[in-house]
Amino acid sequence: MLVSDPRSRRIPKIVGTNNGTFTGFSHMRVLTTAPDEVRELLAHWTEGSSLVVVALCAAWCDTCNEFRASFERIAEARPDILFVWLDIEDDSDVCGDIDVENFPTLAIYRGDALLHFGISLPQQSTVARLVDEMASRSAGGSAAPDAVVSLPRTLRRHFA
């Protein structure tokens, strides 16, 4: 799982959890290794005005691997927004029953309200425009499976 920190421009990579104990890290800049800090970042999600962008991808997906650098650049350019990268297999304990038909799939929330759920072109400019559009929305209205709608609560429970 990758979580950006809206308080800074650095992005941590958290790989594999075992009941909240982190088991490894990637080559990326690591901001936090403490579960309390991850919980604090996820608490940011509950603030009604906070925008959260979740990329649902897979490590084996070449498109996802190419898209990841673009996703990180968008996160660095928008420190006011929380960005979360979930690997649907490595983070299956969090993703649960979310059915991803193609990659990358994005879920964008304002607080717990889902604004957008769908496949995106893996282009930085396309995703940046989508994020900007969703940032200007004040309320949700995207239809999606229950597992997607409840993802904010699932993540918070996972790190509780």
Regions found by a protein language model. Give the residues of each.
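Acidic/histidine-enriched, glycine/proline-rich intrinsically disordered or flexible terminal extensions
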Residues: 136-160
